[in-house]
Every structure is written in structure tokens, then in C-alpha cells.
Amino acid sequence: MEKLQQRVKEDGVVIDGGILKVDSFLNHQIDPELMYEVGETIYNKYKDEGITKVLTIEASGIAPAIMTALKFKVPCLFAKKSVPSTLTEEVYHTDIHSYTKNKTSHVVVSKRFLSENDRVVIIDDFLANGEAALGLYNLVQQAGATCVGVGIVVEKSFQSGKQRLLDAGLDVTSLCEIAALDNGKVTLVGEGEL
């Protein structure tokens, strides 16, 4: 996705510790046209797979996930990082550690919304170590559903996440692959190569 890659290069802010801040279009302020293109790209990858549900984790995965679900014309389900008092039914649950926040969250989805009949695409805003996507995959497995693939908006290719997902047998589609975050600069995979 050339437009996404351009936005990451132009508007992304590199923070010490291998963190990329993209709050101007993805995880604080959202560019809906860009998120629509993200959803459309993921839809085109999995459109013949009988998708019945799009799954993400709150909060930054919701925008790309809902646009993906819109294209599929299926529900978007997001795992909650805390159990609200209104969630009184049985849930699937797992623990997910956030690389960026260095915090572990106990996440849940209602058993009413995820079943063995579902064919799921998992969406996440970032892929670093793969914890969020693997945690969501764990929820899919608990339900007996099928995970058709994982759509990632921004992948930090210099970290182990993608390999961990591939090792788990998952199909991974990354729309913007980052090779390095050095000296305040974003380097994309394939940049500078002949």
C-alpha cells in the first residue's frame, strides 16, 4: 500500500526503543480514507475465503478492523481489555502483553459473538513481537473457529512477530513493512535495494 507507506515515512515519528508514533493517522487521530484503503486491501486478499467475522483488540485496531468488516459486510468484534459490568455472559479470555505500553492486559470476547462456525480475519494496527495477534488467535482457537489470516497495518520486520505468526501456521498480510527505525528515520523493507 503505497499511500500507507508514504504516510508512515512522512508522518511517523521514531521514538527511542524502536517505537513508531503514527498518531496523526492511525492510533489517535484517524484518517478514514486511508483506513478504508487498508480495509479494501485486506478484503481483496481474503475475499474468497468465506469470512464471517473480523476480530481485533481495542483500541487502535478498531479503525482498520471496522473498515475491513465493512468491505466484507460482516461484524467487527473487538476484544476488550477490561470486563465491563454489562458483560455478564460467558467469555473467552487470554492475556496479551503490549510491547509499546509494556503492560499485560486480560482480554475477553463474549462467547455469544465468536463460535466454531466463524471464519475469522484478525486485524492489528502494529506487529512487533506478535503478542496481540497470537492472543487473538488464542481466542479464535478457544471458540473452535477458523483463523483464515492476519492483516497487519504496520509491521516491524526487524522484530520476531511475523515469524512467530508464521510458525503458528497463520497467513500474514502486512501492508507496510518497516526494516529499521534508526536515527529518527523510518526505513521500509526493500528501500534502497536494486
Curated annotation (Swiss-Prot):
It catalyses: XMP + diphosphate = xanthine + 5-phospho-alpha-D-ribose 1-diphosphate. Pathway: Purine metabolism; XMP biosynthesis via salvage pathway; XMP from xanthine: step 1/1. It holds the Pfam family Pribosyltran. Its main location: cytoplasm. GO terms for biological process: purine ribonucleoside salvage; xanthine metabolic process; XMP salvage. 5-phospho-alpha-D-ribose 1-diphosphate binds at residues 128-132. One of its GO terms (cellular component) is cytoplasm. GO terms for molecular function: xanthine phosphoribosyltransferase activity. It comes from the Bacteria. Keywords: Cytoplasm, Glycosyltransferase, Purine salvage, Transferase. It is found in: Cytoplasm. Xanthine binds at residues 20, 27, 156. InterPro entries: PRibTrfase_dom, PRTase-like, Pur/Pyrimidine_PRTase, Xanthine_PRibTrfase. Homodimer. HAMAP family: XPRTase (MF_01184). NCBIfam families: PRK09219.1 (NF006671), XPRTase (TIGR01744). Belongs to the purine/pyrimidine phosphoribosyltransferase family. Xpt subfamily. Converts the preformed base xanthine, a product of nucleic acid breakdown, to xanthosine 5'-monophosphate (XMP), so it can be reused for RNA or DNA synthesis. This is Xanthine phosphoribosyltransferase. It comes from Macrococcus caseolyticus (strain JCSC5402) (Macrococcoides caseolyticum). The gene is xpt.
